[in-house]
Curated annotation (Swiss-Prot):
Subunit structure: The complex is composed of two ATP-binding proteins (OppD and OppF), two transmembrane proteins (OppB and OppC) and a solute-binding protein (OppA).
Name of the protein described by the UniProt record: Oligopeptide transport ATP-binding protein OppD
One GO BP annotation of this record: peptide transport
Gene: oppD
Bilayer-crossing regions: none
NCBIfam families for the chain: oligo_HPY
Residue stretches making up the ABC transporter domain: 24-309
Amino acid sequence: MALKATNFFTEPEYKLQDDLILDIRDLHVSFKVKDGIMQAVRGVDLKVKKGSIVGIVGESGSGKSVCVKSIIGFNDGAKTTAKLMNFKNIDISKMKKHQWQYYRGTYVSYISQDPLFSLNPTMTIGRQVKEAIYVSCKRRYYQTKSDLKYDLQTERIDLDTYKEKLAQAKETYKAKTTKAAVHAKTLEILNFIGIDQAEKRLKAFPSEFSGGMRQRIVIAIAVATEPDLIIADEPTTALDVTIQAKALNLIKQLRDLLNITIIFISHNISLIANFCDFVYVMYAGRLVEKGLVEEIFTNPVHPYTWALMASIPEGTDKNAPLTSIPGYIPNMLSPPKGDAFAARNQFALAIDFEHQPPFFDVTETHKAATWLLHPQAPKVEMPADVKEKIAITRKALAIKMPSQPVKQPKSNGNKKTKTKSAR
């Protein structure tokens, strides 16, 4: 079916800071199910800098995937609201179906958990990569035509400028979509991601590759469209440890080479520690802690982050049982009052069961939503097993723990609290 030129994207009232590519504020996503309304995401704020790798970590069911799928319109049947959803000064909260068609795979690419379900089993990998290149070029060309037409109609440009820029866009489109150009780019990408004998393997089908190689092909398709942002939704879950490391290293190389921004989703906190620049910790549809990777993994302050750190298998005595977080994520049909983690938190205070904590500042970039950071809260010692895991992480990150205690945090809220322990 021929692609149809879209209207221009809606521009948000708020313009992004120069260093940001994405700014989301107060995001809520819910689903109507048989038993009621499932509140998957509850008031999430995300800021993503250009060229960064941002990690979102949490247990399965925390709302990580639902949160990022709202960025690409993949939450079918969901009710999505936000005060702001700004991607490259495009208001994605007002996107229509035909606009999503241009946006996905052109500006944003998505890498899913299982490559087997991302690839068409009836098409060769060469054809699939080439199709991604061709379609993205065509979409960008038609979008440019639409934008130029709008600029002409609104007198942002004159007729001569319109004709000149349109001719340039057409020339670029033709040059990039010749058979030779698309073939050459496909080979270049496959060679870079480590597909041996790329020319020969162009005619191979997905079933002829291992799981690790299939995931590399999915990554190739994702970068072939030259997106500004790649969302990697637990892309290494189905891979063994050795292949995981290779896949992550490949994604990082592509980020450095192409200056692509990456949002990386995982329930594996050790992967996040070794891969990301900035980290959001998510639980029961809310963010509970956020900060630079070295801040989160050398000075975590939220009990949920402590629990995730303690569950890292690295450094655990081979004869000792693995640590797990007791209890379960609450039923999001009726989220609990107060802090959703309180029932599983051995350090919970009485107020945790009554009021949702605001974010407290640990540093300018490190914040956490826990009443333990309130000036009147009792002092709580970080668990010994968490300290052990921090020591391991510190070595991996090649940085040192702060030698001085953290300054007394400042609250973003004015609520007074009772600090009596509930335990």
